Every structure is written in C-alpha cells, then in structure tokens.
C-alpha cells in the first residue's frame, strides 16, 4: 500500500473532480495504516518501552507520509487530550489535513484516528517523526553517486589509488 498516494482532499472535492477512486483507495489505505499502527503499538510495547521496530514495521508497509498523515489526524481529533505533547500537537496542526464532513456534518477523519492509549500514540508519533527525518536526510548511495559530477567521481577514484606516505 506504499504506492497509493495520500489523497488530502475531502470526499466532496473528489466527487466534483472525478477522483472518487483515488479518494477511496487512499482512505482504505489510511484505515489499514491506522489498524497497523494499533497492532504495532500492541506488539512492540513491552516493559514500559515502545520499541522503534513498531515504526519500522508500519513504515515498511505504508511509508512515512501516510503514517504521519494518520498520526496528524489522530492528534487533531484528540486535541483535548493532555497526554499528547505540545510539540506533537503543534506539529499535527501544521500538517495539511482537510476537514471531511459527511452528510450529517461528522468529520470522516474521525474514523482514521488511532484508538491506542494516547500516551503510546504520542510516543509512536515522536518515533515516527524522528524516523521520517532520518530517512529524508539519508539519500541512497546510488542517488549520491548520480548527483556527483563525473569529474568529481573520477577525482575520487584517482585519490584512492595514490599511495600515501
């Protein structure tokens, strides 16, 4: 589900623009991501420690963008909950999430809110944000090699062959 893009517009926008299939696929992936986060927290919380493997497990399946989107929705939906850190609340407010009202005025995003203990969701959010930043900063070796000009790459090879005294 990593390849399904996050659709950030409400259902009405999708309907008006002929993008209902994209909206539904994204919403389905986000709901599955929510469930995967709940499962990962349950499986990786032991001895009062939430292990980083929880984030890695979900990121492998859904990618960081969707995880962070679902977590931002969760924190916004539970803004009243003091167990979320001020830092995570501020971050969640900065993530672009459109209100998605149904025919009765209920925000459909409430169905994407993670239902694990808020303190653990806060910790999972902190770990997920750190993990996402770490992955942003580390370009692959292939990307780094492709971005180097040919002269610099050849220069690096020459230097490696020269014996040092």
Language-model-detected regions and their locations in the chain:
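Gram-negative host-targeted secretion-system effectors, predominantly Type III and Type IV
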Residues: 1-164
């Amino acid at each position: 589900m990593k390849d399904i893009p996050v659709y950030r517009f409400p259902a009405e926008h999708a309907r008006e623009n002929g993008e209902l299939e994209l909206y539904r696929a994204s919403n389905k992936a986000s709901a599955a991501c929510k469930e995967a986060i709940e499962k990962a927290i349950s499986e990786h919380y032991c001895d009062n420690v939430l292990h980083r493997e929880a984030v890695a497990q979900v990121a492998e399946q859904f990618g960081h963008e969707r995880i962070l989107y679902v977590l931002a929705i969760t924190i916004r939906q539970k803004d009243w909950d003091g167990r979320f850190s001020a830092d995570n609340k501020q971050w969640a407010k900065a993530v672009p999430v459109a209100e998605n009202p149904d025919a009765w005025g209920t925000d459909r995003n409430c169905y994407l809110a993670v239902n694990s203990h808020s303190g653990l969701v806060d910790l999972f959010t902190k770990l997920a944000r750190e993990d996402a930043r770490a992955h942003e900063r580390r370009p692959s070796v292939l990307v780094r090699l492709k971005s180097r000009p040919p002269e610099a790459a050849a220069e690096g090879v020459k230097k490696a062959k020269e014996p040092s005294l």
